[in-house]
Curated annotation (Swiss-Prot):
InterPro entries to which the protein is assigned, alphabetical: Leucine_aapep/pepB, Macro_dom-like, Peptidase_M17_C, Peptidase_M17_leu_NH2_pept, Peptidase_M17_N
Record: active site: K277, R351
Enzyme class: hydrolase
Gene3D superfamilies noted in UniProt: Leucine Aminopeptidase, subunit E, domain 1 (3.40.220.10), Zn peptidases (3.40.630.10)
Catalytic reaction list: Release of an N-terminal amino acid, Xaa-|-Yaa-, in which Xaa is preferably Leu, but may be other amino acids including Pro although not Arg or Lys, and Yaa may be Pro. Amino acid amides and methyl esters are also readily hydrolyzed, but rates on arylamides are exceedingly low; Release of an N-terminal amino acid, preferentially leucine, but not glutamic or aspartic acids
Function: Presumably involved in the processing and regular turnover of intracellular proteins. Catalyzes the removal of unsubstituted N-terminal amino acids from various peptides.
Name this protein carries in UniProt: Probable cytosol aminopeptidase
Amino acid sequence: MLNVNFVNEASSTNQGLVVFIDEQLKLDSNLIGLDQQHHGLISKTIQNKLQFTGKYGQIKVIPSVIKSGEVRYLIIAGLGNEEKLTEAKIEELGGKILQHATSCKISTIGLKITNRISRFTSQTFASLVASGAFLASYRFDKYRTTLKEAEKFAVESIEIFTDNSTETAKLFEIKKLIAEAVFFTRDISNEPSNIKTPQVYAERIVDRLEPLGVDVDVIGEREMKNLGMGALLGVGQGSQNESKLVVMEYKGGSKDVPTIALVGKGVIFDTGGISLKPSSDMHLMRYDMGGSAAVVGTIIAVAGQKLPVNIVGVVGLVENMLSGNAQRPGDVVTTMSGQTAEVLNTDAEGRLVLADAVWYAQEKFKPKCVIDVATLTGAITIALGNTYAGCFSNNDELADKLIKVGEEVNEKLWRMPLHDEYDAMIHSDIADMANIANVPRAAGSCIAAHFIKRFIKDGVDWAHLDIAGVANSNKASALGPKGAVGYGVRLLEKFIKEYT
């Protein structure tokens, strides 16, 4: 794991030294002295606009001309227009710096924070850069046994020189704790489905959360049957691995602090069931539990900080598999709420899992607010691509708060519509509702949201986040490699911290 330290005075023991330059291409007094130490290398570089323009995100790695000392490289990072810098952009810049250092095999980095950006203190700026670098250091290579030495290379440490290093370190410790929660979410999402069975996944949740003072209850199929969870159990009935409902309760607030319930879809692997998925990308269905992973990661972050809030997490862990016992198209299931659902398509299974999970959360904990998170529909990816998750809500204020926080942490949400006409499209002739629309290929994400909405009680504020397009990525970003993104943890953690 990347080691991050904050110091008040610069050290000469790092192989790479990072400085920040904005698009004005001017050196402040501190950088002038550093430039002189390096025989004008910084000023010569920024004078040549073919080499460096100072635009945001530009990174220039230059071999040092100093013959003595440990510094082998100067790394010049572009800030662009300082007025347009956001916390998210600063974090991403930290990630880019780490990635460039890794590609250049620079094992130790020093960062010199000399810039005075009006909207950010040097402590905030430094902690954000460190947070981005730490997030970008994540790897999932535990099953790669033949990695070459060059592929194993990782930056060992970052040392950040800034005023008031003690205060900066405190800011970073919170960000590091949140990043480690993101890492749990990425880890469990990246894990192959033959390893992370519902039982194993539940055990990992217990092992991670109980030391943080979170009460965890793992409910098996017998108890779920007694509770009447026919929708969730129907999804998992084709698997030889028993389905689980994991209930997490963090009681950090007083009794008069309203409870927020986070509910996650945890389909460990989704074949589509008898309504079989195409084989080409079916291996990616190991990520179909990304919503549940975001819920668990959020509770790790909240409990780790001992926030004065009351949070409940409920995740339904199932496998949607083919067998002689698998659920059939046309089956009717009775949900915990007593409502019945006709299963017209076994690949629309996530909403069935959530139906029982959100009802259980409301029945047992009486929350003021329910937020469910799910890799629910391919339709949301068609609508929004891989930039935004879809946000459906019965409460404008709740939706606005989530969207605002999403912009701040760069986990973007786009408000999607709910309408009575969509609700009418899940009519069934033989049950209370159908799990897909009676109009083929129409408004798929909206239809799924309305199915879940049928299980939200009157007076409960509700938001449904469809993260199917953003939970995993087929390319690296500034904050991590391709694979599981860990989307939702930072969004929900900040929402809970700021608005409860």
